[in-house]
Design a protein with these regions (language model features):
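A conserved beta-strand-loop-helix scaffold within acyl/acetyltransferase catalytic domains
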Residues: 215-231, 235-255
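N-terminal charged segments
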Residues: 1-86
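A conserved beta-turn-beta hairpin within the catalytic core of GNAT-like acetyltransferases
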Residues: 58-64, 242-251, 261
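Conserved GNAT acetyl-CoA-binding A-motif
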Residues: 86-96, 277-288
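Conserved active-site alpha-helix within GNAT-family acetyltransferase domains
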Residues: 98-107, 267, 291-310, 317
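Acyl-donor-binding surface of acyltransferase catalytic domains
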Residues: 68-138, 142, 152, 164, ...
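Conserved acetyl-CoA-binding loop-helix of GNAT-fold acetyltransferases
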Residues: 73-80, 253-256, 262-275, 279, ...
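A short helix-loop-beta-strand connector motif used in the catalytic cores of GNAT acetyltransferases and
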Residues: 37-43, 87-90, 107-109, 216-226, ...
Length: 321
């Protein structure tokens, strides 16, 4: 049994938090936590329904007080003091529930979900787009001989990644010249360097940033990474975290190079990762997206994802107030 620190903080676990979650929103937040689990998770008897997250200031998601209940506790001085001792120059934050925004809201984060049984199959078109949505042409279904093989059934294995040609129709306008290669989708358990570097760049600029980024990206019980490359250059990456919490898999780290956007790249990666999630036993897919990222929201909606709830990062009251 863990011993509390002198100021009363006690290490906690994802399972303990799940056992104490009071509603569907809290349970989904625990699944999101399992997908992006920091090195330090602490609970305090005087802050019921809260968990203090710390990962050396790398991302707000891993360095804020997660409030699982419907409201912020009346006093959060204990958390403010804890963060102030470790990061005095950084304003401590709490992540709290908020009403679903009615439009673009720079401070809100939307949590979107879907039932994987209803998710479009890899390569399946997703229907007409609304005129106000960014035009992203879905990829047609690949031929059976080129479909990617399934990843290993155990998320803890280090299987050999699989590779498949991405359908060239929406991505390769014009004739193919000598030596020109179309984009290829690569799925596997190996962490893409591009994703590691992009995450490490969100640290404090110290030599430990790469190791801390790797710890976050490999923290879930299982991960599947998607990489799209073209001409020897990575033009898209995404991560699927198999959380082991209520059959939820979490999608994050979706990035597409500017020159490859609006060509179906993100949708193609997401469909294939959703297929892997189902194969690994997940029944639900969840993700977080900032409420003012209208292009990403439109892409996820076309794939059948809907709003579940919203949260926002709220500054904690200064210590002593």
């Amino acid at each position: 049994m863990s011993t509390p620190t002198p100021d009363g903080w006690l290490p906690t676990t994802v399972q303990t938090l799940l056992d104490r979650a009071g509603d569907d929103v809290a349970r989904l937040e625990v699944a999101l936590l399992a997908a992006w689990r920091p090195t330090t998770l602490l609970a305090h008897a005087d802050l019921p329904g809260c968990v203090l997250r710390w990962h050396h200031q790398m991302t707000k998601r891993a360095n804020s007080l997660l409030v699982l209940g419907p409201t912020l506790p009346r006093s959060t001085a204990l958390a403010t003091s804890w963060y102030a001792r470790r990061a005095p120059a950084q304003a401590p934050l709490a992540m709290t529930r908020c009403p679903l925004p009615q439009g673009p809201d720079r401070g809100a984060v939307l949590i979107m979900t879907c039932d994987l049984a209803q998710f479009p199959a890899a390569g399946q078109a997703t229907g007409a787009q609304r005129p106000d949505q960014p035009q992203e042409t879905p990829s047609p279904a690949p031929s059976p001989t080129r479909a990617p093989a399934l990843w290993e059934t155990s998320p803890s294995t280090t299987s050999s990644p699989c590779s498949s040609p991405v359908s060239p129709a929406p991505w390769e306008a014009g004739p193919r010249g000598p030596g020109r290669q179309g984009p290829r989708l690569h799925l596997g358990s190996r962490l893409p360097r591009v994703l590691l570097e992009r995450t490490a760049a969100r640290g404090m600029g110290t030599p430990d940033d790469v190791a801390r980024a790797r710890a976050l990206l490999l923290c879930a019980p299982g991960q599947v990474f998607a990489t799209v490359s073209q001409g020897g250059e990575v033009v898209g990456v995404a991560r699927l975290a198999v959380t082991g919490v209520n059959d939820v898999a979490v999608l994050d780290g979706v990035w597409v190079a500017p020159r490859s956007r609006r060509r179906g790249t993100a949708s193609h990666m997401i469909r294939h990762l959703a297929h892997q999630a189902r194969h690994l036993g997940a029944r639900h897919l969840a993700l977080e997206v900032e409420a003012d990222n209208l292009g990403a929201i439109a892409c996820y909606e076309r794939l059948g994802m809907g709003l579940h709830h919203a949260h926002r990062y709220t500054p904690l009251a200064p210590w002593g107030t």
